[in-house]
Amino acid sequence: YCYICHSLQYNADLQPANTCIYLVVTWVMTVLDVLPNVYIGTIEYDPRTYTCYFNYVNNPAFTVTIVCIHFVLPLIIVGYCYTKIWIKVLADRDPAGQNPDNQFAEVRNFLTMFVIFLL
């Protein structure tokens, strides 16, 4: 997304210092993402699988929040990025050489890729 839609800023954004900042932000967000599991749910041991797991089944609000954060939000972000890339690619193409049948095929291919990503 950054390379295609923001190509002029791409090299400036991926300097070593900025890359380190992006890595730190990613790790901080990951830790913040796990913290609700520690404070809201309970950690239980499953002797059948010899593992510990977070038990938050009795809290439906927490379950809905987790689904929104872990599924809906990434889906919206990826959908936005794919749409912006698609718009950029279509805008940069030569409109004189386009065939209406090709446009329909391109839309169908884009939607197929997006649905496959969803699955």
From Swiss-Prot:
Membrane-crossing segments per the record: 18-38, 63-83, 114-119
Annotated GO MF terms: melatonin receptor activity
Subcellular location: Cell membrane; Postsynaptic density
Alphabetically ordered keywords of this record: Cell membrane, G-protein coupled receptor, Membrane, Receptor, Synapse, Transducer, Transmembrane, Transmembrane helix
Keyword RNA-binding recorded: no
Membrane-side (Cytoplasmic) residue stretches: 1-17, 84-113
Subunit comment: Homodimer, and heterodimer with MTNR1A and MTNR1B. Interacts with KAT5. Interacts with RTN4 isoform A/NOGO-A. Interacts with TGFBR1.
Function according to Swiss-Prot or TrEMBL: G protein-coupled receptor that plays a role in numerous physiological processes including regulation of energy metabolism, neurite outgrowth or cell migration. Promotes self-renewal and neuronal differentiation of neural progenitor cells through activation of the NOTCH and WNT/beta-catenin signaling pathways. Modulates the KAT5-dependent glucocorticoid receptor signaling by modulating KAT5 subcellular compartmentalisation.
Name of the protein this chain belongs to: Melatonin-related receptor
Source organism: Rattus norvegicus (Rat)
